[in-house]
């Protein structure tokens, strides 16, 4: 399996698969009428005003037991849109699991209208093994909308898409960076789609990143099927970040307010910027990395952002920012090879000074501190 760091971190990185990845279906069937048909979901009746915990079968285990994933369905008394919240499509990305828990607890089983379908653990097999991938080493988030007759990943993706995504009006997919990386709390989506852009802005998250998403990703497949979907990206794999969970929970509530499921008034952010260009700064040398920046830091082009040392402690190279902007993500593993992704910088042109002013006034860009920088003389 390829190390995601070779292609960047999180949803957009190059991910390992077993052999060549089959192409998912291009045009999934999406019902004309959204929501629960006959008030039923996964064989269980969920009437308006009800809340139900459901087990959704998506596969089978090696012991021939049903491979089920948990789902929580909340319904308002009045008719309205259906929204899905999906988490742990990558099994070791668990911040979203906590976000769903806090979201459901905060709603206390009450919606003003419409339906919320929350999937705290989409990749049950990876989650049980604390692994990003499925047992066949495929990345579930490269196989949507799926195929009922395809490989394991395609079949699970097909179940999730047909039973959850296709009956929804919009959705949000919750992710973290891949192992060995940490990401700023930010929203990704296809800002060229007006409905998607509206959802992105509605979350109130300060940093938005324009990206259609990799082919086969949940949000891209859903958006192409006419179901505008965005992605919340924050923190790192296999651990909870309290701050990321708080921001993600608030973002999800803002989205639900925007589409009318909850009565809370939408609170516009004091600052918000849309990043349209971003690149990873990569290493030209192997060695031991000492980074000077964290996700959320603002940097200037040519600014030193880290140093590389050899095992004897000798200085090998200085890493510089290749553009001015905001640090979207960093490598947290200090052991690097040439070409590895070190720092992901989102380019800010007109809004860089506004971002600085916002931070200076006490504003929060979704900052996540990985570790105190190790300062060295002469570095």
Please place each PLM-identified region on the residue numbering.
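Structured catalytic-domain cores with a bias toward divalent-metal coordination
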Residues: 2-379
């Amino acid at each position: 399996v390829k190390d995601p760091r070779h292609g960047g971190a999180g949803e957009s990185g190059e991910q390992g698969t077993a052999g060549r990845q089959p192409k998912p279906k291009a045009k999934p069937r999406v019902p004309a009428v959204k929501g629960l048909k006959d008030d039923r979901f996964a064989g269980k009746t969920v009437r308006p005003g009800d809340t139900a915990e459901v087990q959704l079968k998506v596969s089978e285990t090696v012991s021939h037991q049903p491979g089920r994933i948990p789902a929580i369905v909340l319904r308002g008394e009045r008719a309205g849109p259906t929204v899905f919240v999906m988490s742990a499509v990558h099994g070791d990305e668990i911040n979203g699991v906590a976000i769903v828990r806090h979201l459901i607890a905060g709603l206390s089983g009450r919606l003003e209208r419409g339906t919320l379908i929350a999937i705290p653990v989409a990749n049950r097999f990876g989650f049980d093994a604390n692994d990003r991938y499925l047992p066949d080493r495929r990345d579930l988030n490269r196989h949507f909308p799926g195929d009922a007759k395809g490989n394991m990943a395609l079949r699970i993706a097909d179940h999730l898409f047909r039973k959850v995504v296709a009956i929804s009006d919009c959705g949000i997919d919750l992710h973290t960076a891949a192992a060995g990386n940490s990401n700023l709390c930010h929203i990704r989506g296809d800002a060229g789609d007006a409905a998607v852009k509206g959802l992105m802005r509605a979350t109130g998250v300060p940093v938005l990143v324009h990206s259609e998403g990799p082919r086969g990703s949940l949000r891209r497949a859903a958006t192409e099927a006419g179901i505008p979907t965005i992605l919340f990206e924050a923190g790192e794999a296999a651990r909870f970040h309290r701050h990321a969970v708080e921001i993600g929970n608030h973002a999800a509530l803002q989205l639900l307010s925007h589409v009318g499921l909850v009565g809370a008034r939408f609170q516009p952010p004091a600052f918000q910027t849309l990043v349209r260009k971003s690149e990873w700064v990569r290493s030209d040398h192997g060695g031991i990395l000492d980074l000077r920046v964290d996700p959320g830091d603002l940097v200037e082009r040519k600014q030193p952002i880290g140093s590389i040392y050899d095992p004897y402690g000798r200085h090998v190279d200085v890493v510089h920012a290749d553009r001015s902007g905001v640090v979207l993500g960093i490598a947290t593993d200090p052991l690097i090879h040439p070409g590895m992704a070190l720092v992901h910088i989102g380019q800010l042109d007109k809004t860089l000074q506004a971002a600085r002013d916002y931070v200076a006034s006490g504003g929060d860009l979704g900052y996540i501190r990985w570790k105190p920088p190790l300062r060295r003389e002469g570095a």
